Amino acid sequence: MLMMFKDILRTLIFTLVPGLIFAFLVMSALPTFKKSGFKNTIKGFFKSLKNKDHLFLFLLLIYFFIVIYRTLFQRDFSYDSLSDVFGGWKIFKTQYTGLDYQVIGNIAMFFPFGLLWTLTFEREEKSVKTLLITLLSSLCFSAFIEITQLIFSKGTFQFSDIVYNTLGGVLGAVIFII
């Protein structure tokens, strides 16, 4: 009985948020489909992607989906999400194993965020302000992921992940500015 309850709970955790997102998207698009028809709505969508603002926003939304899926839905349940809160700072594991791919992965995962964020929202201004806004946005998105992982017991909460993710976002913005 307990096993069945855990299975039902796990199914809800894995499917509730994607289901809510899917339902929201369908309900948001429904009035347009009813008014213009499916074919005209699809044509209008692809036509809107010719506008750079729409294209970059579309790519940013795809990026958000991929990162959220990878960090929240593709993880196993963790019984102790707070087991290594202050771990993960070392860039090198040992002299024999080389680089820690988790650190590089965290930086690389947020690099597109910084680039797409600046292309979408800060394209007109290439300045320190752009870097600060991207830093804050990267920090907030990374903290959202880590806190959500903690709430739903997905992976382990680590401050180093937030720092390295934020660094990746800032590096993406630096490439935009250069």
Regions found by a protein language model. Give the residues of each.
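Bulky hydrophobic segments
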Residues: 1-154, 159, 173-178
